[in-house]
Amino acid sequence: MTIQNVIDRVRMIKTGCVIDDLRVIEDINRVENYIIKDIVSKRTGDEAAQDYGNYDEETPRDRELLAPAPYDTVYVDFCCAQIDREYEDSERYVNSMASYNNGMTQLKKWWWQNHRQKKLNRFYERGF
């Protein structure tokens, strides 16, 4: 999924809301940084994440994001949850965050099944 795909999907889902591209990009950065810090950095393959999570309005909108399909829905879920929070729609916020948390759990399981644990000196780094 690309940055523009996330922006378009959020706009499609939240049709009655005022949505700023920069705000969506900031939320994408938050999700990417969480993925890097809590999922990717504890396993091999973390060198792939070096160029992610630092997007701004100058970043090309066709930039691919870190989470692969089918786990890439976490970006849309998180952005929608933040909009729901701003509009004080607690029921939708809870639903969006539940979907986001489920997606993150699935992404973490997939990443950790497909990437070996990092070895620091002679010991493995503790994780999940």
Residue ranges and their predicted role:
Residues 64-74:
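Structural motif
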Residues 73-85:
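Short, hydrophobic/amphipathic alpha-helical patches that form generic packing surfaces
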Residues 83-93:
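Short helix-capping/linker segments at secondary-structure and domain boundaries
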Residues 88, 99-101:
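Charged interaction segments
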Residues 94-98, 105:
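Short, compact, well-ordered microdomains
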